[in-house]
């Protein structure tokens, strides 16, 4: 699989940039993930980092070289990333869970699956 990646992140009006961007690939599949911590909420940048790391690590475990069921994979990995963020909040005794938006796209077999 051949591909070119270009990424750009802009801080906007906030004091810190909470964007996290990652991609990983196997011989036959490509995963791209974008997370943007929700400004105004506690630890949004941490939530974005946890989500990106969790999703990319799951892909690296599952893509052999393809993900067996892309829809199921993305559904499960998003739910599990959410639980990882909740676990972080619990472990750190935070008054509320950190928040982030996440978009993931898995490309394989000539098809893109997004969530």
Please name every model-derived segment.
Residues 1-115:
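PP2C/PPM-type serine/threonine phosphatase catalytic domain
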């Amino acid at each position: 699989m051949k591909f070119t990646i270009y990424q750009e992140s802009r801080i906007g009006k906030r004091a810190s940039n909470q964007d996290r961007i990652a991609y990983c690939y196997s011989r036959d599949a490509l995963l791209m993930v974008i997370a943007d911590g929700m400004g105004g909420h506690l630890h949004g940048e941490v939530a974005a980092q946890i989500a990106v790391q969790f999703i990319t690590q799951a892909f690296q475990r599952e893509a052999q070289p393809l993900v067996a069921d892309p829809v199921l994979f993305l559904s499960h990995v998003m739910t599990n990333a959410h639980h990882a963020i909740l676990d972080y909040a619990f472990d750190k005794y935070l008054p509320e869970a950190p928040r982030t938006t996440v978009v993931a796209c898995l490309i394989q077999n000539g098809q893109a699956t997004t969530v």
